[in-house]
Amino acid sequence: MRTHYCGHLNKSLAGQTVELCGWVNRRRDLGGLIFIDMRDREGIVQVVVDPDMADAYAVASQLRNEFCIKLTGEVRTRPESQVNKEMATGEVEILAKGLEIINRSDVLPLDFNQKNSEEQRLKYRYLDLRRPEMSDRIKLRAKASSFVRRFLDDNGFLDIETPVLTKATPEGARDYLVPSRVHKGSFYALPQSPQLFKQLLMMSGFDRYYQIVKCFRDEDLRADRQPEFTQIDIETSFMTSDQVRAVTEKMVREMWLELLNVDLGEFPVMPFSEAIRRFGSDKPDLRNPLELVDVADLVKDVDFKVFSGPANDEKGRVAVIRVPGGAELTRKQIDEYTGFVNIYGAKGLAWMKVNDRAAGMEGIQSPVAKFLSEDVINGILERTQAESGDIILFGADKANIVAEALGALRLKLGKDLGLTKEGTWAPLWVVDFPMFEEDDEGNLHAMHHPFTSPLGLTAEELKANPAPAVSNAYDMVLNGYEVGGGSVRIHNAEMQAAVFDILGIDADEQKLKFGFLLDALKFGTPPHAGLAFGLDRLVMLLCGTENIRDVIAFPKTTAAACLMTDAPSVANPAALEELAIAVTVAKEKSAE
């Protein structure tokens, strides 16, 4: 039906007759001539309809926005004075010779010329995707997927599919369950990841595997999460963690170079402990210059329990953030930041303004200065390298609360005060994660997943002292987002059973849930390691947006609902009966 896309037309085609198909982006009547901005997925071109072309003019007079049309016309160069430098096709226009209405359009429930609510955009997603901004994002996603396949194919990886209907395994989130009609009372689980299957593929000898795959997690959502998401899943045999990081870093660097013409440079490597100590996060945004500085040793003897208490607690921490120019913050702003850290469990936010460093104590303004000696204050100023005009913000509590609260505050301050270098890229690898994390009851849980190998320990050594164990795991972080995570896997049945034991999974449960894996580990399993990227998150960063819904064609809301199709919906009673399922919905208590 067409010979060209609208957005591909240029001066080299001048004088040629082209056939275009697309939509009316805008129509204007000017002095007898009708101008149409015609749009398709590749862009917009201006069409001129002259009254001398009577048939085309009659059709053009009927056009309204979003009519679907077909056009036959001649490409001509615009006069220099009429070139539109804002359009990729701005040097040319099409003189209409034939015009056909393929389909008319009702008045749209969306206004493409102003901001629509996200609810409306999701309800009429098929219309929202017509907007050039959205179309460009989906096209960039397609290019990213194509690049990944090409890169991994060229590096000897095999694209192998794994099951979607599988067995529930503990991976940190709730499973989406699918009832079996044949095996009544039994359920499949939709995979949270292909983790075990890709490990089994290594045991099968396939050596290098990848898959761009849908995964499902029934968890509380946020801007960068969806109940169904797409993973670039990778697994290798006979490769070290350094080698896995090298090939996947190369993939991301080449992707950014090809799609954005940006050289990310070599990724620095940072241990987990350093990331938490300096930035309060295991996914630090290195575009932000603010850092956490520990001062517990300076305040452990002060007569101020808010500081000395955590400073003398082995699980406590006292740290500060020096904010350049922060002395200009008003009391109201400081109170707002105090309320912000309260969200993360902090009880307050002590502060110290350095109005004049040269003036000594007289140049210090702080509600806690009276509790601190001049030596302590000078020690804090020296350690933070504070200058006149700065403010120092304190966190004093359990170490995890200080890290989380000040880590979040660091990001907020960076954004609010313009300290974060927008428009730049700051990748890194975070490595050497703790193998386990402890809950409030003292129980250990796998920080990543229970198939991650410990670093430099035998099964006996791990069982003897599991709490301080470090895992052979690694995360790729870009601008404060974890875009990929992986590890060296356990390839020994004894070690895998030891990890299950530590996690409180007894022998019977091990056999029930993971018997197939433990059996497979007995048959010459090769050492293997892998990594999975979140494709949605990678594309979100490529597109410069902050919400993965912007880069998914048909996303769900934060309530895991599809506003367009009204999914999820109530099932047909006959279908439920065939599945031997009875649905009970708890009734809300009526107000008394």
From Swiss-Prot:
<comment type="function">
    <text>Catalyzes the attachment of L-aspartate to tRNA(Asp) in a two-step reaction: L-aspartate is first activated by ATP to form Asp-AMP and then transferred to the acceptor end of tRNA(Asp).</text>
</comment>
<keyword id="KW-0436">Ligase</keyword>
<dbReference type="GO" id="GO:0004815">
    <property type="term" value="F:aspartate-tRNA ligase activity"/>
</dbReference>
<dbReference type="InterPro" id="IPR004115">
    <property type="entry name" value="GAD-like_sf"/>
</dbReference>
<dbReference type="Pfam" id="PF01336">
    <property type="entry name" value="tRNA_anti-codon"/>
</dbReference>
<protein>
    <recommendedName>
        <fullName>Aspartate--tRNA ligase</fullName>
        <ecNumber>6.1.1.12</ecNumber>
    </recommendedName>
</protein>
<keyword id="KW-0648">Protein biosynthesis</keyword>
<feature type="region of interest" description="Aspartate">
    <location>
        <begin position="195"/>
        <end position="198"/>
    </location>
</feature>
<dbReference type="Pfam" id="PF02938">
    <property type="entry name" value="GAD"/>
</dbReference>
<dbReference type="Pfam" id="PF00152">
    <property type="entry name" value="tRNA-synt_2"/>
</dbReference>
<dbReference type="InterPro" id="IPR006195">
    <property type="entry name" value="aa-tRNA-synth_II"/>
</dbReference>
<feature type="binding site">
    <location>
        <position position="482"/>
    </location>
    <ligand>
        <name>ATP</name>
    </ligand>
</feature>
<feature type="binding site">
    <location>
        <position position="489"/>
    </location>
    <ligand>
        <name>L-aspartate</name>
    </ligand>
</feature>
<feature type="binding site">
    <location>
        <position position="448"/>
    </location>
    <ligand>
        <name>L-aspartate</name>
    </ligand>
</feature>
<dbReference type="InterPro" id="IPR004524">
    <property type="entry name" value="Asp-tRNA-ligase_1"/>
</dbReference>
<dbReference type="InterPro" id="IPR029351">
    <property type="entry name" value="GAD_dom"/>
</dbReference>
<feature type="binding site">
    <location>
        <position position="226"/>
    </location>
    <ligand>
        <name>ATP</name>
    </ligand>
</feature>
<dbReference type="InterPro" id="IPR047090">
    <property type="entry name" value="AspRS_core"/>
</dbReference>
<keyword id="KW-0963">Cytoplasm</keyword>
<dbReference type="GO" id="GO:0006422">
    <property type="term" value="P:aspartyl-tRNA aminoacylation"/>
</dbReference>
<keyword id="KW-0067">ATP-binding</keyword>
<dbReference type="InterPro" id="IPR045864">
    <property type="entry name" value="aa-tRNA-synth_II/BPL/LPL"/>
</dbReference>
<feature type="binding site">
    <location>
        <begin position="534"/>
        <end position="537"/>
    </location>
    <ligand>
        <name>ATP</name>
    </ligand>
</feature>
<comment type="subunit">
    <text>Homodimer.</text>
</comment>
<dbReference type="InterPro" id="IPR004364">
    <property type="entry name" value="Aa-tRNA-synt_II"/>
</dbReference>
<dbReference type="InterPro" id="IPR004365">
    <property type="entry name" value="NA-bd_OB_tRNA"/>
</dbReference>
<dbReference type="InterPro" id="IPR012340">
    <property type="entry name" value="NA-bd_OB-fold"/>
</dbReference>
<dbReference type="InterPro" id="IPR002312">
    <property type="entry name" value="Asp/Asn-tRNA-synth_IIb"/>
</dbReference>
<comment type="similarity">
    <text>Belongs to the class-II aminoacyl-tRNA synthetase family. Type 1 subfamily.</text>
</comment>
<keyword id="KW-0030">Aminoacyl-tRNA synthetase</keyword>
<keyword id="KW-0547">Nucleotide-binding</keyword>
<dbReference type="GO" id="GO:0005524">
    <property type="term" value="F:ATP binding"/>
</dbReference>
<feature type="binding site">
    <location>
        <position position="217"/>
    </location>
    <ligand>
        <name>L-aspartate</name>
    </ligand>
</feature>
<dbReference type="GO" id="GO:0005737">
    <property type="term" value="C:cytoplasm"/>
</dbReference>
<feature type="binding site">
    <location>
        <position position="171"/>
    </location>
    <ligand>
        <name>L-aspartate</name>
    </ligand>
</feature>
<feature type="binding site">
    <location>
        <begin position="217"/>
        <end position="219"/>
    </location>
    <ligand>
        <name>ATP</name>
    </ligand>
</feature>
<dbReference type="GO" id="GO:0003676">
    <property type="term" value="F:nucleic acid binding"/>
</dbReference>
<dbReference type="InterPro" id="IPR047089">
    <property type="entry name" value="Asp-tRNA-ligase_1_N"/>
</dbReference>
